[in-house]
A protein has these predicted regions:
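Substrate-binding/catalytic subdomain of NAD(P)-dependent oxidoreductase enzymes
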Residues: 84-111, 121-123
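Catalytic phosphate/nucleotide-handling subdomain of diverse soluble enzymes
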Residues: 105-154
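Active-site/ligand-binding loops adjacent to catalytic centers
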Residues: 1-97, 140-154
Length: 154
């Protein structure tokens, strides 16, 4: 999320101009600690409705780094609005996910549009969460301005 961008910030070198990498199992954990200390010192808190990532300190950041190295992956951010769209697209297909997992859908679309993901690339998107914030999709669909909203009929 743009409002909770820990992995993207560290992986893309947006903190101290150093790109955090898995480094064959030897990631610079001191960089992670300094990043968290910086957030605390500046009083910076994640700003997202996606409750699964509001903590801003991913419990599995090292697993994420390992996966990025293994897959030659990239890290990007998407807005809360985009995550809601992604969550709704999943819902339109009869499945269910929570808001942060909606980032998977729109993140892939964003990377395709930026031509980072090419037409013939193999892409695997993993949605790790199920719908736990039941009112988020209800509120999304009540607002007909949302891209994929299906408002209730009276």
């Amino acid at each position: 999320s743009e409002g909770a961008s820990t992995l993207s910030d560290l992986y893309n070198g947006k903190f101290e101009n150093e790109k955090l990498r898995w480094n064959n199992g030897n990631p610079n954990t001191e960089l992670i600690s300094r990043y968290y200390d910086h957030l605390d010192k500046e009083g910076l808190r994640p700003k997202t409705k996606a409750t699964a990532i509001q903590i801003g300190r991913p419990a599995n950041i090292l697993k994420g780094l390992r996966a990025l190295e293994f897959t030659n992956g990239v890290a990007t951010t998407v807005s809360d609005s985009e995550m809601l769209d992604g969550m709704s697209v999943v819902g339109l297909n009869g499945f269910d996910c929570e808001m942060a997992s909606g980032a998977t859908v729109v993140g892939i679309k964003k990377l395709i549009n930026a031509e980072i993901i090419k037409k013939d690339d193999v892409v695997v998107g993993i949605l790790t969460g199920r719908q736990k914030d039941a009112m988020i999709p209800v509120d999304y669909h009540r607002n007909s301005d949302n891209k994929f909203a299906i408002p209730p009929k009276n």
